Amino acid sequence: MDPTHQPFRLYAEVIVNANINKILDYGIPAELENLVTVGSVVKVPLQRKLTNDKYKIAIVLKIKSSSDFVHVIQPILDISYEGITLPQDLIDLIFWISQYYFCPLGSAVSLFLPTVYAQTHSTKHQNNVFLGQNAERTQEILKTLDNPQQIAVLRKLLKTTKPLTPPELMRKTEVSAKTLDALVKQKFIRIVDSADLEIQDEQLHYFLPDPPTLNQEQLDAVNTISQSLVAEQFQTCLLFGVTGSGKTEVYLQVIRKARALGKSVILLVPEVALTIQTLSFFKMHFGSEVGVLHYKLSDSERTQTWYKASRGLINIIIGPRSAIFCPIQNLGLIIVDEEHDSAYKQSDLPPFYQARDVAVMRGKMTNATVILGSATPSLESYTNALSKKYTLSVLSKRASTSTPTKVFLIDMNLEMEKTRKKPFFSQTVIRSIEQRLEVGEQTIIFFNRRGFHTNVSCSSCKYTLKCPHCDMILTFHKTERILLCHLCNTRLSKPITSCPQCLGTMTLQYRGAGTEKIETLLREFFPTARTIRLDSDTTRFRGSHDALVKQFATGKADILIGTQMIAKGMHFPAVTLSVVLSGDSGLYIPDFRAAEQVFQLITQVTGRSGRSHLPGEVLIQTFLPQNSTISHALAQDFPAFYKEEILGRKVCNYPPFTRLIRCIFLGKCSDYTLKETQRVHTLIKQNLDSQASLMEISPCGHFKVKDLFHYQFLIKTRNILVANKQIQEALAAAKLSSKVRCIVDVDPVTTFF
C-alpha cells in the first residue's frame, strides 16, 4: 500500500482487553509516537461510536509503518497506567495462556492488568469505611441497636467485600453523615485513609516465630536451589518438607541470595488469608522492598503496587495466584508455597489457569529459579521430581525448635456403640481439650462444613429442602436465621413452618452440623473457654480474618474452630492439640483426586500443633479407621501414600500419566443442553487424535446451578495444544445455539463438581 495514503505515520498491533481472539491495528497519533512502544498499556476505542471517555485497555505488540485497514483505522486515545510497559516475557505469557488454557487473547490480557476499572495510576488517597476494631462482634452489636440507619450501615458493611467510601456507603444505605459520625464515636466503624491501610512494622510481631538456626537439610536445600539462581538458568525445585520443617526459613535465605544478586522475587501463597502472615514475616526482614497484591485491595492500592513493581521500587511481591502476573523488574526467583493447593487453580471465571504451572512457564521464559514448596506435594509435581524434570530437596524432620507430634486415630464406630448415637465429639477429644484448657495451651478444631445445620428435612415425606435455583441442599445459618445455598448464595430468610412438598406442619427436622454448631457445642462443653470461629461467614468483611487470627495468635482465645482455611500454613506456637472431627468426609466424593486431597488436608492440619518447644498432639476422628489414605496420613508417610495412589492413577490413565480437558455445557433446558453436548461430543470423536481418548457424557456433580443444567465429558491427552485445536474445530462446526454455553477447563482440579 502506498504510504502516502496512510492517515498515520505509525501504527500499533494490539491485544484488546475484551472477549475477542484477534490482534487489531490502531493508529498512533503524532503526540504519542515517542510514548507508545512494544508492551505499552494503552487506551483504545473498540467501537467507532465510543467517545474519549469510553475505551478499552490494550497491550501493544508491534509498531509498524503501515496498515491494511486504513479505511477503518482508529487512533490510540492515550497511554495508561503512567506509561508502564509490559516486558516481553509477559507478552509471550499472554499468548501461551491463550493457547494452553483455551481462551481468547483478550481474556488472557485481563490477567496482566491490576484492574480493568482503574483508568490511570493515581497517588491520590481516599477514605474507606470499615467495621470497628471489634468487627467479629458486629452480629452481637446489631442486636443492641435500635437505630434503623445505624443497623443498615453495619449490615451493609457485613455483606460487602470491597472498600466503600463514605459517600458510597451513604448512598447505598440512604443515611446521612451524622449516622456515620455516631457509629465512629461508638467505635462500631472506622473511616481510614487508603494510604494507612498498609501494614505497619510494629503491627507484625505477633505473627513472627523465633528465627531458628538452619539444620543441615535446610542448608543443603538452600545450596541446591542457589546454584541455578547464581547461574541465571531456569530450574524448578520441589522443596518437599514435612510440616514444621522450616520451609519458610529456606525461602528467606534464597530470597536473600536473589536480592544480593539484584534479582526480584514473586512469592505465591494459596489464599489471601495466608498473605498477612507471610507478608508479616518477610516485611520484617526486607522492609519497604516488599509489596502485596490480592483482590481484596482497592483498585488504587492494587494499581500503586503494580506501578511500583514495574518501576523497580518494589522487589519482592507476595500474594495469591494473581500475583504471578505482576510486571516486576528483573525477575529471578518465583516461590509457590503450598504448591499442591487447589486455590492456585482459577475455577470461577475464565481463563481457568493453574498459577503453579504458569509460575513454572514464566520462570522458563525469564531463566528464573522456581521453588515449589509443600509438605504434601501434588502427585504431578512429585512425579516430575522423581523423573528428574525437577530437582528435589527434602526436609525430612521438623526444625530444631519443634517437637515431634503424636497422632492418634479415634474409631467413631466404637463411640457410636457406647453412646447409641452419632456424636460429634468423642470422649477422648473432650478430655484432651480439657487438659489444654487447664494448662493454658491452645486447641485447633478442623471441620470442613459451614453453617449450623447442614440440612432441613421432613420426617413425614422425607423431602429435603433444596435451593430453588440449584441442585443443592440448603444449609441453616443460625446467627442470621437464614437457609443459605452455598452454590448461588440464595437466602431464604422467612421462617419455614411447613413442608413445601407434603405441607405437613411440625414435621421439619434440622440435621447435620457445620462450624457454627460445633462452636455452640464447644461453648456448652466448656463455658469458660474463649472460642473463635474462622470460616467464610466470619471472615467475609475486610480485616475480619486478620483480626481473628491476631486474637488467637496473641493468646486471647483458647480454641479455634474452622474450615480448611485454618489448615494452611499458619504458625501458632501455643497450639498443642489439633482435632480433625471428620477425617473421612472427603473420601465419599467420586473424584480421582479425592484421596489425595484428604491426605493433604489431614497432614496440613497435623502440622498446626507442636510447632514450638511444646509437644503437639493430633486426634483424627473417622468412621473408616482401616482406610489406607487415613492410615498413611496418620503415619505422615507421603512416599507410602504416593506409591499406592500412583498405581491407581496409572491403571485408570489419570494425571500425571495424562492431561485432562474437561468440557462443560450449560443451558436452561436440560434435554436441549444434553442434545447440544452430544452433537459436539460426536464431532470431537470423529476427529480426535488417535493417542487421545474421549470419555462419555455425564451430568456434573452439581447438575443444576443458578437455573442452568450442566453436562460434561473429559478428554485424556498428552498434547493439550493439539486437543485444544480439535475442540475448537468441533465447536466451530457445531455452531452451538446461543441457548447453550461451552466451558473448556484444561487441567481441572476436579472432574465431579
From Swiss-Prot:
**InterPro entries, sorted:** DEAD/DEAH_box_helicase_dom (IPR011545), Helicase_ATP-bd (IPR014001), Helicase_C-like (IPR001650), P-loop_NTPase (IPR027417), PriA (IPR005259), PriA_3primeBD (IPR041222), PriA_3primeBD_sf (IPR042115), PriA_C (IPR041236)
Q: Which GO terms describe its cellular component?
A: primosome complex
Name the domain of life: Bacteria
Any keyword Cell membrane? no
Q: Which UniProt keywords apply?
A: ATP-binding, DNA replication, DNA-binding, Helicase, Hydrolase, Isomerase, Metal-binding, Nucleotide-binding, Primosome, Zinc
The protein's annotated catalytic reaction(s) are: Couples ATP hydrolysis with the unwinding of duplex DNA by translocating in the 3'-5' direction; ATP + H2O = ADP + phosphate + H(+)
Q: Which Pfam families match?
A: DEAD, PriA_3primeBD, PriA_C, Zn_ribbon_PriA
How is the cofactor bound, as the UniProt entry phrases it?
A: Binds 2 zinc ions per subunit.
Q: Where does ATP bind?
A: 241-248
Under Gene Ontology molecular function, one entry of this record is: zinc ion binding
Q: What class of enzyme is it?
A: isomerase
Q: What is its EC number?
A: 5.6.2.4
Specify the Helicase C-terminal domain's residue ranges.
491-646
Q: Which GO terms describe its biological process?
A: DNA recombination; DNA replication; DNA replication initiation; DNA replication, synthesis of primer; double-strand break repair
Q: Does the keyword Repeat apply?
A: no
Residue sites binding Zn(2+) 1 per the record = 458, 461, 499, 502
Residue numbers of motif DEAH box? 337-340
Q: Which PANTHER family match?
A: PRIMOSOMAL PROTEIN N
Which protein family is it in? Belongs to the helicase family. PriA subfamily.
Please describe the quaternary structure of this protein.
Component of the replication restart primosome.
Describe the task this protein carries out: Initiates the restart of stalled replication forks, which reloads the replicative helicase on sites other than the origin of replication. Recognizes and binds to abandoned replication forks and remodels them to uncover a helicase loading site. Promotes assembly of the primosome at these replication forks.
Q: What is this protein called?
A: Replication restart protein PriA
Q: Which organism is it from?
A: Chlamydia trachomatis serovar D (strain ATCC VR-885 / DSM 19411 / UW-3/Cx)
Q: Highest lineage ranks of the organism?
A: Bacteria, Pseudomonadati, Chlamydiota, Chlamydiia, Chlamydiales
Gene this chain is encoded by: priA
